From Swiss-Prot:
A lipid is attached at residue 35 (S-palmitoyl cysteine). SUPFAM superfamilies: Band 7/SPFH domain. GO terms for cellular component: caveola; endosome; plant-type vacuole; plasma membrane; plasma membrane raft; plasmodesma; plastid. It is found in: Cell membrane; Membrane, Caveola. This is Flotillin-like protein 1. The lineage of its organism: Eukaryota, Viridiplantae, Streptophyta, Embryophyta, Tracheophyta.
Length: 470
């Protein structure tokens, strides 16, 4: 079924397919759904709230509240639809709900204030009631559109506000009498003040008139004296101007006379100067004539000699330049040769140094490799190097030469008898060699103090000697 709400109504739809409540102006309502139409137009609620002040004085607060749902807030409409819409907005349930909220907040607020505070601060009291009631109505989705709180009235049997009004009326009447008396007093005082001020102002005006008259007379006298003084000053100034003009005229006449005399002297001197200049030019022309004549006589001969000397000097200069260039070229070539030799020597030394560095690096690598091979045994490394470099052979040669020079008696060690030939003879030679080795090693140790390598064996009674290095 398709339902449409009126302008002041909403559709509250619940049921399958709707999580909570769906609000709409028009919608399809299916059989498995429920639809409630609620009106959102505001309603006037009239109350006479009975409350009690902090002094336990009762009073009645007549009020008219215009209350309705908050149509501009969907959450407030949902609250209203959930809590209020099941009841008629004009029903006793809604009326009692609103009345209970208003009475409760009004009584709580009135209990915290005295009657004097409530009566004098009626506007603030009404505002506090309005704010607190609105705060409570928010939880029902309601809003106060208008609140008209009337004048506080007494509860039957209590005449507090009547007495308070009478007190106010009496105070107003007394204040009016006081104001009238003060007005009369101010009027009489003002009249006397006006009369005194009139007399004072008249005397003041008379005195000021006399003062102004005297001032005017004095100003007239001063102006007359001032005019006379200015006339005298003007006359003196004009006389000074005439004297100054006469002096300037005399000075100009003297200057003109001086200029005329100077002009006459300058004209005379200019004539003499011009005469001297012309005489000088005549003498110069005579000298030039004689010079040209002498040039004609001697210039040709001098020119020939000059040209000859110049050519000879140029030739000598050319020869000296060429000799100097040859010497310079030879020196440059010698310097270049010396530089090339120095570069070659430097390059040779550089390469030799690089070779030594490379050899040292290779030997270092070689020694590190050997040392790692013998497990850091320096004795084995030393023996290997001596054997590899033929040190023992050199020692043997040196000892043989020394023995030969000494011509010692040679002892031959032979162990065991002779046996048959073949492989037996070869084994006999090897056995004899091994038998002769210990005496040889003993002899070497006695003469040089050097022990045989560890892989050959050790000597009995051989003690390592301490080598003292200085």
């Amino acid at each position: 079924m398709f339902k449409v709400a009126r302008a002041s109504q909403y559709l509250a739809i619940t049921g399958a397919g709707i999580e909570d409540i769906k609000l709409s102006k028009k919608s399809w309502v299916f059989p498995w759904q429920s639809c409630t139409v609620f009106d959102v137009s505001p309603v006037n609620y009239t109350f006479k709230v009975q409350a009690m002040s902090a002094e336990k004085l009762p009073f009645v607060l007549p009020a008219v509240f215009t209350i309705g749902p908050r149509v501009d807030d969907d959450d407030a409409l949902i609250l209203y639809a959930r809590l209020i819409s099941p009841h008629d907005k004009d029903s006793n349930h809604v009326h009692e709900l609103v009345e209970g909220v208003i009475e409760g907040e009004t009584r709580v607020l009135a209990a915290s204030m005295t009657m004097e505070e409530i009566f004098k601060g009626t506007k603030e009291f009404k505002k506090e009631v309005f704010d607190k009631v609105q705060l409570e109505l928010n939880q029902f989705g309601l809003v106060i559109y208008n609140a008209n709180v009337k004048q506080l009235v007494d509860v039957p049997g209590h005449e507090y506000f009547s007495y308070l009004g009478q007190k106010t009326q009496m105070e107003a009447a007394n204040q009016a009498r006081i104001d009238v008396s003060e007005a009369k007093m101010k009027g009489e005082i003002g009249a006397k003040e006006r009369t005194g001020l009139t007399l004072q102002n008249a005397a003041k005006i008379d005195a000021e008139s006399k003062i102004i008259s005297m001032q005017r007379q004095g100003e007239g006298t001063k102006e007359e004296i001032k005019v006379r003084t200015e006339v005298k000053v003007f006359e003196n100034q004009k006389e000074a101007d005439v004297a100054k003009a006469n002096a300037e005229l005399a000075m100009k006449k003297a200057a003109w006379t001086k200029d005329a005399q100077v002009a006459e002297v300058e004209a005379t001197k200019a004539v003499a100067l011009r005469e001297a200049e012309l005489q000088t030019q005549v003498e110069k022309m005579n000298a030039l004539t004689r010079t040209e004549k002498l040039k004609a006589e001697f210039l040709s001969k001098a020119s020939v000699e000059y040209e000859t000397k110049v050519q000879e000097a140029n030739w000598e200069l050319y020869n000296k330049q060429k000799q100097a260039e040859a010497v310079l070229y030879e020196k440059q070539k010698q310097a270049e040769a010396q530089k090339a030799q120095a570069d070659a020597a430097f390059y040779s030394k550089q390469k030799e140094a690089e070779g030594l560095v490379a050899l040292a690096s290779a030997q270092g690598t070689y020694l590190r490799t050997l040392l790692d091979a013998v497990q850091n045994d320096y004795s084995c490394l030393r023996d290997f190097l001596m054997i590899n470099n033929g040190i023992y052979q050199e020692i043997a040669k040196t000892n043989a030469m020394a023995v030969r020079d000494l011509q010692p008696k040679i002892s031959v060690w032979n162990h065991g008898g002779e046996q048959g030939g073949g492989s037996g003879n070869a084994m006999k030679d090897i056995a004899g060699l091994y038998k002769m080795l210990p005496p040889v090693l003993d002899t070497v140790y006695e003469q040089t103090g050097m022990q045989p390598p560890a892989w050959i064996g050790t000597l009995r009674g051989a003690e390592p000697k301490q080598v003292t290095r200085s």
